[in-house]
């Protein structure tokens, strides 16, 4: 009995020593090139986050959360359904209004009278204020001494705003969707076109004078 106990103790000791001498499970995998397991990634302190980290974090949140359509970027928003029953085939602008609904749209506005950039700032600011009072959300950017950009968040109202702008005394021109609309203040070009016609009329003035001289010569002959 004592011998059997000693034999069991020796066997247990040998088994335990073999287990202790075995290498860890990942030891062989680490020795083979290209199959080494990467070390665990250390979490970055949020105080050290840069713009790229914040963008990735925001994308992760957007995937997990349901975002309302109004908060989505414009290119990710679904297009508004078009009611074809309200379209007027005789007015192409009505089709454009429907397709631009809920989309950002820009138009170029030219101020007449060769203004300075400061004058353009003041004049277009008055127009923007009038549109704001009429409940139109319009942003304005000066892009030249006589030119400004009017940007709308809802492009379906662009043609109504265009009609307002072209009726202003100092509006020379409005460019919208590649189409140029002359403004009330853009009449200087038409006046320049009419000047040569006036000059032609002046060139034709000598003709009636010649007829008067002929009449005088005829009256003298009658006297003789």
Swiss-Prot record:
Output the InterPro entries linked to this UniProt entry: MESD
Q: Which GO terms describe its molecular function?
A: identical protein binding; low-density lipoprotein particle receptor binding; protein folding chaperone
Q: Which Pfam families match?
A: Mesd (PF10185)
Q: Name one GO cellular component term.
A: plasma membrane
Q: Where is the composition biased (Basic and acidic residues)?
A: 187-224
Effect of gene knockout = Disruption of embryonic polarity and mesoderm differentiation, likely resulting from a primary defect in Wnt signaling.
- Segments for region (Chaperone domain): 1-155
List the signal peptide residues: 1-29
* Subunit structure as annotated in this protein's UniProt entry: Monomer. Interacts with LRP5; the interaction prevents LRP5 from forming aggregates and chaperones LRP6 to the plasma membrane. Interacts with LRP6; the interaction prevents LRP6 from forming aggregates and chaperones LRP6 to the plasma membrane. Interacts with LRP4; the interaction promotes glycosylation of LRP4 and its cell-surface expression.
Q: Which family does it belong to?
A: Belongs to the MESD family.
Q: What is this protein called?
A: LRP chaperone MESD
* Record organism: Mus musculus (Mouse)
Q: Report the gene name.
A: Mesd
């Amino acid at each position: 009995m004592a011998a059997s106990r000693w034999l069991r103790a020796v066997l247990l000791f040998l088994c335990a020593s073999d287990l202790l001498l075995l290498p860890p499970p990942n030891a062989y995998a680490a020795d083979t090139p290209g199959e080494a397991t990467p070390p665990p990634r250390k979490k970055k302190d949020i105080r050290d986050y840069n713009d790229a980290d914040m963008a990735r974090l925001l994308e992760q949140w957007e995937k997990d959360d349901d975002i309302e359509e109004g908060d989505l970027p414009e290119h990710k928003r679904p297009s508004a359904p078009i009611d074809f029953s309200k379209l007027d085939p005789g007015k192409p602008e009505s089709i454009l209004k429907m397709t631009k609904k809920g989309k950002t749209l820009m138009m170029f506005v030219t101020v007449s009278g060769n203004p300075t950039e400061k004058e353009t700032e003041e004049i277009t600011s008055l127009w923007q204020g009038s549109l704001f009072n009429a409940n139109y959300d319009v942003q304005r950017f000066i892009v030249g001494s006589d030119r400004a950009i009017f940007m709308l968040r809802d492009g379906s109202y662009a043609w109504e705003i265009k009609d307002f702008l072209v009726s202003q005394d100092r509006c020379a021109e409005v460019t919208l969707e590649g189409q140029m609309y002359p403004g009330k203040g853009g009449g200087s070009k038409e006046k320049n076109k009419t000047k040569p016609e006036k000059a032609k009329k002046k060139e034709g003035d000598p003709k009636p004078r010649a007829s008067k001289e002929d009449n005088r010569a005829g009256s003298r002959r009658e006297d003789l």
